[in-house]
């Protein structure tokens, strides 16, 4: 199992894209757990970054979409992020979004563990319903990443986690009923989260994974919005 985990990290170390973190290696120096070594990002993560009200989240979403498209369509085999959310997107020195903190399932399932503050508490808000339900459909996939992308879009435009202010149990219950987040109605958020952006969210939240847009299509939509 550990050898398989190391192979997965090795695969991630081969990823080369401006919107995907460069994996330099792994270490067990911190509490004996397996941690990924990567370049330090001075600007922190996207969730904290957009708390600065002068930041336009649109270009960040463009970068996230570009990173996901690279992962989902790479020639060496598709890679699924599996844990996309604002706190797992870092901001480079030039202000670009960089996908980080992949959910490396082999590492998580091994005797080692990946430690991420708040992972168990908040990931549910971004997770596709088929993942929450488990079973055959409960695997990482491009479709599940697209659902999480829509939630991350909402997060960065509202500067709040999806389904705010509902508790974990309330979120799980709402999703089980086929309900997605309500559209914000406050003037400040609406000035950023226009009809085009909101429609993009809604399409990503289709409860049928096969009816969600591909990230390539989402990227094309965002490029048109950004023009």
Q: What are the language-model segments listed below?
A:
Residues 5, 9-10:
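Regulatory alphaC helix of protein kinase catalytic domains
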């Amino acid at each position: 199992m550990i050898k398989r985990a190391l192979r997965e990290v090795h695969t991630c170390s081969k990823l080369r894209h401006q919107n995907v973190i460069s994996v330099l290696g792994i270490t067990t120096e911190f509490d004996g757990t397996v941690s990924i070594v990567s370049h330090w990002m001075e600007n922190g993560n996207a969730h904290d970054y957009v708390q600065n009200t002068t930041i336009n989240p649109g270009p960040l979403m463009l970068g996230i979409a570009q990173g996901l498209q690279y992962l989902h369509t790479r020639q060496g085999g598709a890679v699924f992020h599996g844990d996309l959310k604002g706190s797992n997107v870092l901001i480079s020195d030039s202000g670009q979004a960089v996908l980080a903190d992949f959910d490396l399932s082999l590492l998580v399932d091994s005797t080692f563990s990946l430690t991420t503050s708040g992972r168990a508490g908040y990931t549910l808000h971004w997770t596709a319903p088929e993942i929450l339900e488990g079973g055959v459909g409960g695997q990482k996939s491009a479709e599940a990443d697209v659902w999480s992308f829509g939630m991350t879009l909402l997060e960065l435009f509202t500067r709040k986690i999806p389904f705010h202010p509902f508790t974990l149990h309330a979120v799980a219950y709402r999703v089980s009923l086929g309900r997605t987040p309500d559209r914000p109605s406050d003037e400040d958020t609406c000035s950023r989260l226009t009809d085009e952006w909101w429609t993009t969210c809604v399409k990503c939240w289709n409860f049928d994974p096969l009816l969600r847009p591909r990230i390539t299509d989402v990227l094309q939509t965002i490029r048109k919005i950004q023009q």
